[in-house]
């Protein structure tokens, strides 16, 4: 069971830092940060059958930041202090993750997306900027499709549209399916049920078509690493399918762009939010 838990950590967004720091006998900054357990900044919202935990930082235009599979608010230790200088940063532990406990059997990206929309309604926010990492990027895309009035501008990194080897690195895709099968064979327990729900998302979700992406009208920055878990050609397809989009592929980068390329990541997204979207066509393509 311990081995299975370790494997789950490897795929989670926090694991990259944890594994690297473990090799040097260091402690992950995500384990010691106040973010994700800040009593002064955190609250619960009772919505859609769960108590959704969220934290807010800073003042200014609202900015929603969404974590990935098995993650939490503390995954954004490098984004919160940067963006809180000029934005009101809102982060939630997605359903069935972090402090947002969900004892139900089902979990989907659509459920998590509608949770976030309900949270924005509760906070009386008509619209906001959005950053999504990994599964959080999927939620960001769905938020822009299902609740288009809520998203002013969107930046996603490491998102995918479907659970196939054409989108996800074949090694990771096959691992997720095999791990799901292994978990299903274990005796049921609250912890195991939670892990099954999360791994099922990796192995069998989402199901978004390129035609659906064309419904996204807000300016969108699509980000990925050239050695990302999400294949670069799939990231390019996402950008090509969204009418008002930019594409940014980081060289020598994997899936954890907000961590290992945090300075570039933060400044590039900040500039994208602050500047008008520029439609590039015709002779403008020579610029």
Predicted regions and their residues:
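Alpha/beta-hydrolase fold catalytic core
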Residues: 3-6, 19-61, 274-287
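Conserved HGGG/HGGXW glycine-rich cap/lid loop of the alpha/beta-hydrolase fold
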Residues: 50-99
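Active-site loop/oxyanion-hole signature of alpha/beta-hydrolase fold enzymes
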Residues: 91-131
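Conserved hydrolase catalytic core segment
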Residues: 126-164
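Active-site nucleophile elbow and catalytic-triad environment of alpha/beta-hydrolase enzymes
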Residues: 196-212
């Amino acid at each position: 069971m311990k081995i299975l838990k370790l494997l789950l950590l490897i795929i989670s967004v926090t694991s990259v830092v944890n594994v690297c720091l473990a090799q040097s006998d260091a402690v992950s900054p995500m384990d010691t940060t106040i973010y994700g357990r800040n009593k002064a900044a955190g609250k619960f919202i009772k919505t859609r059958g769960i108590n959704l935990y969220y934290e807010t930082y800073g003042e200014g235009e609202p900015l929603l930041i969404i974590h990935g599979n098995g993650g939490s608010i503390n995954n954004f230790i490098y984004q919160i202090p940067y963006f809180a200088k000029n934005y009101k940063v809102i982060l939630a532990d997605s359903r069935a993750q972090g402090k947002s406990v969900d004892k139900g059997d089902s979990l989907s990206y659509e459920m998590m997306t509608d949770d976030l929309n309900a949270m924005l309604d509760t906070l009386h926010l008509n619209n906001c900027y959005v950053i999504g990492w990994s599964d959080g990027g999927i939620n960001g895309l769905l938020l822009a499709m299902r609740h288009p009035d809520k998203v002013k501008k969107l930046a996603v990194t490491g998102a995918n549209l479907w659970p196939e080897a054409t989108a996800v690195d074949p090694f990771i895709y096959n691992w997720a399916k095999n791990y799901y099968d292994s978990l299903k064979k274990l005796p049921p327990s609250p912890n195991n049920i939670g892990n099954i729900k999360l791994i099922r998302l990796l192995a069998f979700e989402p199901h978004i078509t390129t035609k659906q992406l064309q419904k996204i009208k807000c300016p969108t920055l699509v980000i990925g690493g050239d050695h990302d878990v999400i294949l670069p050609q799939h990231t390019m397809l996402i950008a090509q399918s969204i009418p008002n989009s930019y594409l940014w592929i980081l060289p020598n980068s994997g899936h954890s762009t907000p961590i290992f390329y945090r300075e570039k990541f933060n400044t590039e997204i900040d500039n994208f939010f602050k500047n008008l979207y520029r439609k590039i066509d015709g002779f403008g393509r020579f610029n």
